[in-house]
Amino acid sequence: MESSWPAQSSFSYYNQGSMQTSSRHASSPTNEYSDRTPRRSAAQPQMPAFLPPPPPHGHQLTESGGDSLPSFSHSLYSPYHGPGGNLPSSNPHGMAHSMPSYSHISALSGTGSGFQYTNHSPMGLNEPLTSHSRSQITHSYHDPPRLPGYSSSPNLHQLSPVSPTAHLLPSMQPPSASPSSSSFPSSIPRTPATLPKGVKRHSLGSEQSFDSWDDEQEMSSGKVTGDRKHEKDSQPWGMPQEEYKKLNPKDKKQVRNRIGARRFRAKRKDYVNQLEAGIRLRDDEITNLQSQLESQRNEINELRLQLKLPLLPRGELSGLGLTMETQGQMERWENNDSMSR
């Protein structure tokens, strides 16, 4: 690489001497871009660390070596613009495109003035970029960021694994999800018509199983009424089952209501009879207790007569079964007690 350096330095820099020199012939691309290693800048300590100023506005370039470059119309230093401009069409040495180099400064002289400027091509090459390198750079700089809310984002499957729109019909899904349906992962389960079909089957089954529901009701009612002696298992509704099945739903409902009312009246009558029987038992018990109380009172009075004590008055029985005595009776009791002593 060292032997391929040009004998004369074909790189002009911005200094007073370069502005006073006459127009020089541009060296061939072979001598100009022979070395593309970072050692080029280290070998020339006089190379300035800054870029020369651009030419004045409206400055036109001359053709150098049969290559045409775009016009430079900026008033400031041009920033890095990615590949895409018109680049020369020759690569003499076939160097790699990604090797860093400071050799993109070329000696191009203007026609109207002696100002020289630098070639601001980002790569400093004379050959067009291949489709592979162009696509890499384009994607690295101009690829728009992907948002997680869009369906084209690769992180969409990290949201909810079961989306509320996954159970919708294809015609009910939002239009934004239809063009990018291929970007969804195949692992997400989709059952778009499960619920509607299930509901439809349920509704059809309910209509078709109306008679079976009646049969179940008949069987259950037959079990309940089988314990009763006044009803037969063969006719739980007061009629044969064949006749009951031939009736329309309205008549069946009337029959069921009539039988239900009849059962309710019978049950209520039984309950009332039980209550009346209990009342009769309580009345008999009260009568027996009253007779016992009267007999015991008579016995006490006989004993008091033997002791020459006043008889027990017949007091009115309270609701609690206690006797109520007046104040005069209490005084007589006290007097009798004092006299007996």
Curated annotation (Swiss-Prot):
Residues 225-234, 242-254 have a biased composition (Basic and acidic residues). Residues 250-269 are annotated as: Basic motif. Residues 279-307 are annotated as: Leucine-zipper. Residues 1-95, 118-254 are annotated as: Disordered. GO terms for biological process: melanin biosynthetic process. Residues 1-32, 61-76, 128-139, 150-163 have a biased composition (Polar residues). Transcription factor that promotes the production of melanin, a pigment that serves as antioxidant, reactive oxygen species (ROS) scavenger and that protect fungal pathogens from radiation and host immune responses. This is BZIP domain-containing transcription factor BZP4. It comes from Cryptococcus neoformans var. grubii serotype A (strain H99 / ATCC 208821 / CBS 10515 / FGSC 9487) (Filobasidiella neoformans var. grubii).
